[in-house]
Amino acid sequence: MSENNCSKPSFPDNAASKEYAASLDAADPLASFRDQFIIPSKANIACKRLAKPNLSPEPCIYFCGNSLGIQPKATAKYLEAQLDTWSSIGVCGHFTNLEDSPMKSWQLLAEQAAESMSKIVGADPAEVAAMGTLTANLHLLMASFYKPTATKHKILMDWKAFPSDHYAIESHIAWHNLDPKESMVLIGPDEGEYEISTDKILSYIDQHAEDAALLLLPGIQYYTGQLFDIPKITEYAKSRNLVVGWDLAHAYGNVELKLHDWNVDFAAWCTYKYGNAGPGAMAGLFVHDKHGQVDYSQGEDSPKFRHRLTGWYGGDRSVRFKMDNKFKPIPGAGGFQISNPSAIDLSCLCAALSVFDQTSVSELRRKSLKLTAYLEYLLLKDTTEDSRPFRIITPTNPEARGAQLSLLLKPGLLQGVSERLQDAGIICDKREPGVVRVAPVPLYNTYSEVWEFVQQFRAALQL
């Protein structure tokens, strides 16, 4: 994927020193953002009871933002404001904009979140909706965009899709009385490899252009951390008359996206990883403007719009409370909403987005490129491919990855390495049978933490 300043950084001879890592932190223009988050302490992550933040002054090293981001300090403030609104004015909170609240009234709150998210995914605000959860949103989008016929029914997807995506796709195929064994086409890497080349994806598109109805891929592959060339793949697939959707769970808040300009048909994402909106937080979806049009040329009572599963909250606010059972959708992605969204969930999402509103994904990406490159440099320094008991299965090309590096350990090493990292107060994700996923997040992680992680990781492997 073409990105600005995406060449791999080079490092000087003293780059492996603790002092050099500290110098990078001192020069980091985004360093102050770390103060806007609550970093779990080493004492707390070992505690067996509920604990207050900062039980001890020593923070853990949290490299698990690709699984769950940490809590912004704004979250408690936003939640308290919402609880005060509910307790003080009850149902009036739906329509009352309180002057000292950081959030709009409840009926406008989803739009507030969607506007901020649109900047993160490169879309017009009307093309984004804050709603539901990732898999539920994928179901809703596939209900609208997956229209199989007898001859054009296949879905092209990732060979190692996150299981929830696999289940969702499989169930939609079965819903149409089709056989998943015939209608699911898994695109995988060459034997012994983990990276899927863009050329291979394009070749699958060519091979199935006549019988595929949908291409649905992850923007970033959750296991390997590979960032796919979204614009190139999208353009090519659409030239072959495929509908194109993307699961951006690991791309949202991680890499630059331009969904509108790339002409993506639809996309969905969760907000609790790099988005920091909390466990199981409200998700988001994108529907390109051309699919969200509402045509009233045949009269106000006969709107024409793309078929979707509907609910009252997708209806235009001007008629939402008329209760006349005449559905008039909100133009754009908002028309795909189903139910009244949780104001509590939206509070957590808006709190997380308030941090992103202070910067840009391009600035975060610039730091992320250097942070992850530094991690890679330290991991590989003074080793050879034969001497290393691990392999980085994430692409070495910075244009083909986000913040995450996936480290595939030799058989039998995962448990011992995981225990060593945990004892050192380092939180990162492990995936059986042998992968450690490490994700330094530019909003709150430091170069010094990268340095310390590598010391502990190498010690665990006796390097």
Curated annotation (Swiss-Prot):
Catalyzes the cleavage of L-kynurenine (L-Kyn) and L-3-hydroxykynurenine (L-3OHKyn) into anthranilic acid (AA) and 3-hydroxyanthranilic acid (3-OHAA), respectively. It catalyses: L-kynurenine + H2O = anthranilate + L-alanine + H(+); 3-hydroxy-L-kynurenine + H2O = 3-hydroxyanthranilate + L-alanine + H(+). Belongs to the kynureninase family. It holds the Pfam family Aminotran_5. The keyword Hydrolase applies. The modification N6-(pyridoxal phosphate)lysine is found at K273. Transmembrane segments: none annotated. Keywords: Cytoplasm, Hydrolase, Pyridine nucleotide biosynthesis, Pyridoxal phosphate. It is an enzyme of class 3 (hydrolase). Its cofactor is pyridoxal 5'-phosphate. Pyridoxal 5'-phosphate binds at L134, T135, F162, P163, S164, D165, D247, H250, Y272, W312, N340. GO terms for biological process: 'de novo' NAD biosynthetic process from L-tryptophan; anthranilate metabolic process; L-kynurenine catabolic process; L-tryptophan catabolic process to kynurenine; quinolinate biosynthetic process. This is Kynureninase 2. Its EC number is 3.7.1.3. GO terms for cellular component: cytoplasm. PANTHER family: KYNURENINASE, KYNURENINASE 2. It is found in: Cytoplasm. Pathway: Amino-acid degradation; L-kynurenine degradation; L-alanine and anthranilate from L-kynurenine: step 1/1; Cofactor biosynthesis; NAD(+) biosynthesis; quinolinate from L-kynurenine: step 2/3. Homodimer. The lineage of its organism: Eukaryota, Fungi, Dikarya, Ascomycota, Pezizomycotina. One of its GO terms (molecular function) is pyridoxal phosphate binding. InterPro entries: Aminotrans_V_dom (IPR000192), Kynureninase (IPR010111), PyrdxlP-dep_Trfase (IPR015424), PyrdxlP-dep_Trfase_major (IPR015421), PyrdxlP-dep_Trfase_small (IPR015422).
